Amino acid sequence: MARLEVDILTLFPRMCAGYLGESILGKAQEAGLLAATITDIRDHATGKHRVCDDAPYGGGAGMVMKPEPLVEAIEAARARLPGAWVVLTSPRGARLDQALARRFAEHGRLILACGRYEGVDERVMTAVDMQVSIGDFVLTGGELAALCVVDAAARLVPGVLGNAASADAESFAGVEGLLEHPQYTRPPEFRGMKVPEVLLSGDHRRIERWRRREALRATRERRPDLFARLSLPESDLRLIEAGDDEL
């Protein structure tokens, strides 16, 4: 049975525990499809106060995470999870996307090291396999990014989602990487806004064409960078401009 094993290394374990225990991720752990461990980096620090940061050499604002506690935490995690990839969450890293999330899910073992303060001592990089970012912005720490990695990868593990087709139909899924089409549920009318007639028609061919058209339109309008990379057949180019009565 495929499953995802992760160990999150953090200075603030409680920030991660609540999220991992709820909803789909909590159920995945109960089912044995996700094994999530949270390690307090301070457990590998020395001294009465278990200090994990210090002033940067050369001066400057803020503090830097010391190498000893984090590297020792990584080494201990590697011993628990042989073959795991060590991923440092950092704005300097490669951008997390659906393809990378799938690689993580398929590999099955991750050690996620969460940075804090002004950054991590560069010597820690000798113990890291890759750095990953969730966007071109800076957070207070790497915990939110680590949770994004776990969530994105775990939902791709077979059995985690109730409907196996859900992950395949979502935004960025598949080879093309289109944004997902709009979704509707009951009631059929809300404050004068009606569900598109085609979705109520029961005509599955029209519904699939409508979803394809809306996914193409959403990608063109909201992510022109993705749309520009697509090699669309003539039928898709016509579909984008088609009205509901032409589906």
Swiss-Prot record:
- Catalytic reaction equation(s): guanosine(37) in tRNA + S-adenosyl-L-methionine = N(1)-methylguanosine(37) in tRNA + S-adenosyl-L-homocysteine + H(+)
Which top EC class is given?
A: transferase
Q: Name one GO cellular component term.
A: cytosol
Which keywords accompany this UniProt record? Answer: Cytoplasm, Methyltransferase, S-adenosyl-L-methionine, Transferase, tRNA processing
One GO MF term: tRNA (guanine(37)-N1)-methyltransferase activity
An example GO biological process term is: tRNA N1-guanine methylation
Q: How does it assemble?
A: Homodimer.
| NCBIfam families reported in the protein's UniProt record | PRK00026.1, trmD
Free-text function comment from the UniProt entry: Specifically methylates guanosine-37 in various tRNAs.
Which family is annotated? Answer: Belongs to the RNA methyltransferase TrmD family.
What's the protein here called?
Answer: tRNA (guanine-N(1)-)-methyltransferase
**Source gene?**
trmD
